[in-house]
A protein has these predicted regions:
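Conserved SAM-binding loop
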Residues: 1-104, 119-123, 189-193
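Short leucine-rich amphipathic alpha-helices used at interfaces
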Residues: 99-100, 105-107, 169, 174
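Short, solvent-exposed loop/helix junctions and linker helices
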Residues: 72, 115-116, 181-182
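Short alpha-helix
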Residues: 114-130
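Generic structural signal for residues in well-ordered beta-strands
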Residues: 42, 133-136
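Ser/Thr- (and often Asn-) enriched beta-sheet segments in non-cytosolic proteins
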Residues: 23, 130-132
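Short glycine-enriched, charge-decorated loop/helix-capping segments at active-site entrances
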Residues: 108-113
Length: 200
């Protein structure tokens, strides 16, 4: 299993405990140090391209990475590299923000957001990249289904017209930002490289 952009290694620790052979791909020297202190295997590399051989991975996981691509060409290359690096039958898990829900906050929450991610754009990107899309899940934090829908409805209150103006007068701008950030909707895609997985 390869994770692109592993953060502080939460998934990596769980994967190793579950018996997976895990490798993180990271660029930040600070995070690389944190990951190695946790005993995780790390490759220092920018992506794309991916620092893996052809058909080297059973699973590639990328959580909130694609929206940081410089544009469609980099997003296509990222997807092509995932396809190249996966074994036939391997799975690509991709988590991205849902721009259609976030709109202006997509840009405000992180200045490095460049590539707009929506359900349809992501489906097209993955299909055009040669993947079979098996599933898409909408989430707010770890909440999905009805719980996500309830949180999404609650989010309407912090996005009412005048909330930003009022927050400036009441000194609650940072609080409103944090609430919006915690109610940020993501899309998780499970995609599969066509072909039969090799039998072990």
């Amino acid at each position: 299993m390869f994770e692109i952009g592993p953060g502080h290694g939460t998934l990596g620790e769980l994967a190793v405990r579950a018996g997976w052979q895990y490798t993180a791909v990271e660029t930040s020297p600070l995070l690389i140090d944190v990951l190695r202190k946790k005993g995780l295997t790390v490759i220092e590399s920018w992506t794309p391209p991916f620092p893996m051989a052809d058909a080297a991975a059973d699973v590639i996981y990328a959580d909130q990475i694609l929206e940081h691509m410089r544009g469609i060409d980099d997003a296509r290359q990222f997807t092509a590299e995932a396809l190249r690096s996966l074994k036939p039958g391997g799975h690509f898990f991709v988590v991205v923000p849902n721009y259609l829900e976030e709109r202006g906050f997509f840009w405000d929450v992180d200045y490095t957001h460049n590539f707009v991610t929506t359900p349809r754009r992501m489906m097209q990107l993955l299909y055009d990249g040669g993947f079979e899309v098996l599933h898409m899940e909408r989430a707010i934090g770890v909440s999905t289904g009805l719980a996500r829908d309830i949180l999404s409805a609650a989010k309407l209150f912090v996005n009412l017209p005048g909330v930003d103006t009022l927050s400036r007068y009441t000194g609650t701008e940072e609080l409103i930002f944090k609430i919006r950030k915690n109610l940020f909707e993501t899309l998780t895609f499970v995609a599969r490289k066509p072909g039969e997985a090799p039998r072990s």
